[in-house]
């Protein structure tokens, strides 16, 4: 049967995280091979005859959960009425894999190294449409084909890919392949049904019940060690086998009409072949998948765009710091040395109020503590990702690393919150510690738990098991909270932060502000430039989460992270200076909200992405999308807001420490 690849990918590939990680030849750094296997993922040698100490003869194929670009609900393999493994041990999964809904299980597909098989029968499924149970299974299968659910198979810890040509004769290797496809009642071919003219019957489903698998191997230099697998590719096909007991993989496609009645039999078969590949080494075997990913040139454009913004802001800040501030300080100090210098003006006027405690200082200090926790966690996670420790080959490592770091970073969160709360003149230290421990994490967990209830109700594999929820709560209550208390203890034990100028007892009246120096316009403007640095990367990150594309360019992401920190800092300092010149000394909350407003632009972009890029249907999927988006927005708000506050705090402390004040 003809199986010409479609002109455009029927699905966007397989997700590995907010959600899968690595720097790979995109910026100077480790070569792809060495980067992927830094953690010590040892190669497995294969040979035609089993040699227990040297190599294996049997090749195991594992199946992962199935997902769709048209639904947020993944399902594990056993939820479908496919051929099931009669035996085999389920691989253990780490915390990150469980949180991302990965459910890896043994499959009924068994191979022997270098042994060719043609049209081998795996199993036959029979459905009687008059039986309620059979009809329910068949309907679930049809719905999954309608929503373009994708298989994800794994051989030797490597995805089995379906490679085909897309626009401009580029080859795209999809780490998944569809269950089947659908021809509408108007004769329109959906998704993968465009690959063959044999898929033409109206209001009919075509199931891919046969796969041609080709495994590529590289012979180890020593020879006696056998060979290592370097690629696994397949081509899905559909056959209505004439003789189900002895299939020959020929004939018309396996069609399931929406109007079909009576008995329907589906025989699942496969063919396997092996080919030696001399040009690909085991250490670089992921390259062919990652190099087929599109838009690398856009990443460079993103970096250049961000650097232009940084240079612009750096020039503005440098001009203020070196010219304006330098002149101001010299003038103020010169005026102080003269007898007739009685009148002050500009930002020096508010020196007696600049460190006045802000309103809602408790809440601000709690936000700063949580933001510090997120900031350090993000930096360390991305740093390890750049080194290759959190690569796609190391499944679930990204989320596991992030969660563990967040738990262990309770101490700096408690310390920062306590130090600033004490400097704000706060005395309710118990409330401060409890809020730091439970407020922001509690909001995230409550949202996450509600989303999990929806996933449970829908029977999705992404629903976190009860045992894992208990484990997460144990990490939070038994490790993170005590560490937060320890950090807060040392924070409150230290003296309050010393300010370079004294605070007056009577607050100074703030003069009437122009439109541009009022709080809201400044806050709205402050988030535009930081968002401009990240919006292109944001597109790829959202693609990896919701469109199941593999994300691996962590070199780019780390650079963008550094640029974002610089941009948030400089934009906040710039606006802070203008507000101080307008004699408005309420800088604490304003600095936090100015850079934190970047998260609002993130939310607006996520809404735009949902309506313009995604094909998600269904109430549950929509609620899940926006529920998880709100978690990301909150985390990003705390992250960027904390950067802005620290930058402004440093700036204000610096400028008021170098002027003479009576």
From Swiss-Prot:
It is a multi-pass membrane protein. InterPro entries: EMP70. It is found in: Endosome membrane; Golgi outpost; Cytoplasm, Cytoskeleton, Microtubule organizing center. Residues 1-28 form the signal peptide. The chain crosses the membrane at residues 300-320, 374-394, 398-418, 437-457, 466-486, 522-542, 554-574, 591-611, 631-651. One of its GO terms (cellular component) is Golgi apparatus. The keyword Nucleotide-binding does not apply. Residues 321-373, 419-436, 487-521, 575-590, 652-662 are cytoplasmic. Keywords: Cytoplasm, Cytoskeleton, Endosome, Golgi apparatus, Membrane, Signal, Transmembrane, Transmembrane helix. Residues 29-299, 395-397, 458-465, 543-553, 612-630 are lumenal. GO terms for biological process: ceramide metabolic process; glycosphingolipid biosynthetic process; regulation of heparan sulfate proteoglycan biosynthetic process. In the intracellular compartments, may function as a channel or small molecule transporter. PANTHER family: TRANSMEMBRANE 9 SUPERFAMILY MEMBER 2 (PTHR10766:SF111), TRANSMEMBRANE 9 SUPERFAMILY PROTEIN (PTHR10766). Belongs to the nonaspanin (TM9SF) (TC 9.A.2) family. This is Transmembrane 9 superfamily member 2. The gene is Tm9sf2.
């Amino acid at each position: 049967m003809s199986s010409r690849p479609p002109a455009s990918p029927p699905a966007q590939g397989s997700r590995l995280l907010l959600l899968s990680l690595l720097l790979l030849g995109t910026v100077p750094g480790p070569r792809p091979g060495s980067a992927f296997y830094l953690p010590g993922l040892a190669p497995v040698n294969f040979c035609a005859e089993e040699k227990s100490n040297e190599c294996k003869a049997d090749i195991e194929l594992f199946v992962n959960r199935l997902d769709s670009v048209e639904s947020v609900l993944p399902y594990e393999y056993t939820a479908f009425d496919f051929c099931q493994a009669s035996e085999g041990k389920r691989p253990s999964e780490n915390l990150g894999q469980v949180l991302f809904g990965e459910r890896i299980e043994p499959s009924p597909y068994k191979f022997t190294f270098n042994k060719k098989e043609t049209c081998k029968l795996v199993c036959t499924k029979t459905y009687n449409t008059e039986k309620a149970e059979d009809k329910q299974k068949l309907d679930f299968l049809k719905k999954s084909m309608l929503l373009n659910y994708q298989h994800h198979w794994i051989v030797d810890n490597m995805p089995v890919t379906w490679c085909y040509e897309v626009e401009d004769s580029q080859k795209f290797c999809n780490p998944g392949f569809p269950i089947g496809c659908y021809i509408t009642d108007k004769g329109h071919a959906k998704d993968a049904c465009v690959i063959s003219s044999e898929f033409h019957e109206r209001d009919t489903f075509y199931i891919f019940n046969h796969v041609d698998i080709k495994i590529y191997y590289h012979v180890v230099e020593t020879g006696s060690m056998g060979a290592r697998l370097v690629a696994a590719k397949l081509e899905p096909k559909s056959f209505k086998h004439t003789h189900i007991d002895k299939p020959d993989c020929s004939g018309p496609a396996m069609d399931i009409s929406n109007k079909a009645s009576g008995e329907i039999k589906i025989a699942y078969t496969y063919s396997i072949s092996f080919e030696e590949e001399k040009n690909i080494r085991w250490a670089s075997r992921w390259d062919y998948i990652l190099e087929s990913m599109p838009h690398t040139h856009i990443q460079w454009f993103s970096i250049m765009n961000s650097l232009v913004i940084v240079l612009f802001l750096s020039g503005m800040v440098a001009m203020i710091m070196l010219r304006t501030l330098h002149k101001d300080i010299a003038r103020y100090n010169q005026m102080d040395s003269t007898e007739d210098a009685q009148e002050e003006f500009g930002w020096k006027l508010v020196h007696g109020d600049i460190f006045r405690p802000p309103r809602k200082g408790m809440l601000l200090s709690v936000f700063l503590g949580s933001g510090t926790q997120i900031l350090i966690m993000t930096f360390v996670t991305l740093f390890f990702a750049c080194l290759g420790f959190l690569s796609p080959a190391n499944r679930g490592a990204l989320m596991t690393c992030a969660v563990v770091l967040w738990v262990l970073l309770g101490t700096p969160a408690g310390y920062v919150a306590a130090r600033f709360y004490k400097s704000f003149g706060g005395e309710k230290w118990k409330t401060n510690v409890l809020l730091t421990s439970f407020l922001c994490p509690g909001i995230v967990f409550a949202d996450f738990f509600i989303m999990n209830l929806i996933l449970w109700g829908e029977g999705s594999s992404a629903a976190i098991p009860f045992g894992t929820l208990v484990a997460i709560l144990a990490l939070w209550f038994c490790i993170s909270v005590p560490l937060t208390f320890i950090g807060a203890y040392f924070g409150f034990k230290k003296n309050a932060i010393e300010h370079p100028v004294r605070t007056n007892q009577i607050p100074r009246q703030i003069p009437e502000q122009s439109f541009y120096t009022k709080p809201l316009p400044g806050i709205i403007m402050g988030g535009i430039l930081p968002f401009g640095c990240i919006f292109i990367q944001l597109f790829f990150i959202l693609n990896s989460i919701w469109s199941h594309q593999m994300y691996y360019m962590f070199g780019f992401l780390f650079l963008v992270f550094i640029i974002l920190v610089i941009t948030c800092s400089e934009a906040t300092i710039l606006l802070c200076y203008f507000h101080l010149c307008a004699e408005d000394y309420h800088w604490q909350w304003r600095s936090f909200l100015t850079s934190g407003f970047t998260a609002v632009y993130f939310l607006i972009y996520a809404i735009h992405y949902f309506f313009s890029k995604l094909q998600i249907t269904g109430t549950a999927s929509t609620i899940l999308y926006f529920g998880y988006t709100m978690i990301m927005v909150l985390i990003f708000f705390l992250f960027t807001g904390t950067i802005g506050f620290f930058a402004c705090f440093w700036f204000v402390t610096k400028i008021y420490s170098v002027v003479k004040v009576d």
